[in-house]
């Protein structure tokens, strides 16, 4: 039946399971009908009974798995609590270590997603990436300690070391850059791009901050909503400003106004409905030439 077992009690209860490889003391000890499993390490896959197509490499990897299928655990204690969940991938010490029934998660890095229990469709790459997520789903995390404090927050995307690092329940946020939106805890639908962009936001919603330290100056936007800040060190002039638009370098915008310019130069602040006019004036044109078409040309039309 093409089973291989090496180690004390390894694969000792196989009845009809085929094409299994169990190496290590108690490896695959409870397996009865599970097929196509590979387990290397002490007590790895030791509770599995009918789960199939699993790979466990490392002491206690997939330790509690019983019927879960198509799981891959590489690293000591990775996916150790998994019981019936399927289609999970964990690479690194303790990665997805608390997962029980959550499915289709990918964790790469020591302790990545290690608190996740029933969450689904999370991807985390980096040491402690998403390490506090318990039930939050549909998160994408790339970077050491990115989204590290999130528990139930969902649909967040964090790219960069410590991006969204203190987020707990906030959802639908996007942070690209080291420390981006780092201080956000409960804010929703914020977007930050650039080193330290939006790092001071805590509970603000629907903010867009693009540029190094945008929204994170001496007066950081913390609870303001619907602000758009574009340019390095652009910011609001109050921590609770709303509907601010600031575009430029090191410029502070005021709630309800559109502010354009750079520090040390002319800055223009616009307010209310703005009408743009297209002028037709010789003063604003160049490369003017005479028209050779006269009345005869017009009469011929």
Model region roles, listed by residue range:
Residues 1-280:
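Glycine- and small/polar-enriched repetitive beta-structure motifs of secreted/surface proteins
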């Amino acid at each position: 039946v093409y089973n291989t077992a090496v180690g004390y009690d390894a694969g000792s209860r196989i009845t009809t399971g085929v094409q299994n490889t169990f190496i290590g003391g108690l490896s695959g000890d409870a397996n009865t009908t599970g097929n196509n499993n590979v387990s290397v390490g002490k007590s790895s896959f030791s509770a599995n009974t009918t789960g199939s197509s699993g790979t466990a490499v490392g002491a206690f990897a997939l330790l509690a798995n019983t019927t879960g299928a198509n799981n891959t655990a590489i690293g000591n204690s990775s996916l150790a609590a998994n019981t019936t969940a399927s289609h999970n991938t964990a690479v690194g010490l303790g990665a997805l270590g608390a997962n029980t029934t959550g499915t289709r998660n990918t964790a790469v890095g020591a302790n990545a997603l290690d608190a996740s229990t029933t969450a689904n469709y999370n991807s985390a790459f980096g040491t402690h990436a998403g390490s506090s997520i318990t039930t939050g789903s549909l998160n994408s995390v790339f970077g050491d300690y990115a989204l590290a404090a999130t528990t139930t927050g969902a649909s967040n995307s964090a790219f960069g070391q410590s991006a969204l690092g203190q987020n707990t329940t906030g959802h639908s946020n996007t942070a690209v850059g080291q420390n981006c939106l780092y201080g956000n805890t409960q804010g929703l639908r914020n977007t930050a791009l650039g080193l330290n962009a939006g790092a001071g936001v805590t509970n603000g919603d629907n903010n867009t901050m693009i540029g190094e330290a945008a929204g994170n100056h001496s007066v950081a936007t913390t609870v303001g909503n619907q602000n758009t800040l574009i340019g390095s060190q652009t910011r609001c002039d109050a921590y609770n400003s709303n509907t601010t638009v600031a575009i430029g370098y090191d410029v502070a915008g005021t709630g309800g106004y559109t502010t354009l310019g750079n520090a040390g130069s002319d800055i223009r602040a616009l307010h209310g409905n703005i009408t743009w006019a297209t002028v037709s004036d010789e003063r604003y044109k160049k490369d003017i030439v005479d028209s050779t078409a006269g009345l005869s040309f017009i009469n011929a039309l």
